[in-house]
Design a protein with these regions (language model features):
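Short aromatic-glycine-(Arg/Gly/Cys) micro-motifs in beta-strand/loop hairpins
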Residues: 14, 19-62, 91, 95, ...
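Predominantly extracellular/luminal cell-surface or secreted proteins
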Residues: 33-37, 67, 114
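Short, mixed-charge low-complexity intrinsically disordered segments
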Residues: 79-134
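Short amphipathic alpha-helical segments that mediate assembly, nucleic-acid/protein binding
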Residues: 3-10, 25, 70
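Structural boundary micro-motifs
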Residues: 3-4, 16, 43, 59, ...
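Short intrinsically disordered terminal tails
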Residues: 1-2, 20, 24, 127-134
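A short, charged, amphipathic alpha-helix used as a generic interaction element across diverse proteins
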Residues: 55-61, 67-88
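Residue-level detector of alpha-helical secondary structure
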Residues: 8-15, 74, 78
Length: 134
């Protein structure tokens, strides 16, 4: 199953689980987050001595904004709307978010910058991120 379909299935599951007494469901946003270092050789932050914190060192991170439609967020990444790349960001996520603090669970899609196409395109998420929630 594609990450795209997984995200749509997650939205459907979440909305069904969180219907209110009137049948109203929460609506998601699709947040665009980008960062500097996409390579698989990233190191972990080591705040005290040599003990890894478990947080990958991605360099600068920026939350660029969000859209209410997944397809619009993907198009913004693919077409580098408003120069999301800013000459320094080479990877990013589209994160599915619902209202609230400390998200109970998220679904996300990983993207890498493509110099030839001048946009971000879906890629396999590196193992180093799979235990980190953003």
């Amino acid at each position: 199953m594609s990450k795209y379909q997984e995200m749509l299935d997650y939205v459907k599951w979440y909305q069904e689980k969180h219907k209110d007494e009137n049948g109203k469901t929460p609506n998601p946003i699709f947040e665009i987050m980008v960062f500097e270092y996409p390579n698989k050789e990233m190191i972990y932050h080591k705040p005290e001595g040599d003990v890894p914190s478990g947080w990958p060192d991605t360099g600068c991170i920026d939350h660029m904004g969000f859209y209410y439609e997944l397809d619009t967020a993907i198009q913004a990444m693919n077409e580098n709307w408003c120069d999301i790349q800013e000459t320094c960001y080479y990877a990013g996520f589209i994160l599915c978010r619902f209202p609230g603090l400390y998200y109970a669970g998220t679904s996300r899609m990983y993207f890498l910058w493509d110099d030839e196409k001048k946009g971000f395109f879906e890629a396999e998420e590196p193992e180093i991120f799979k235990h980190v929630a953003y």
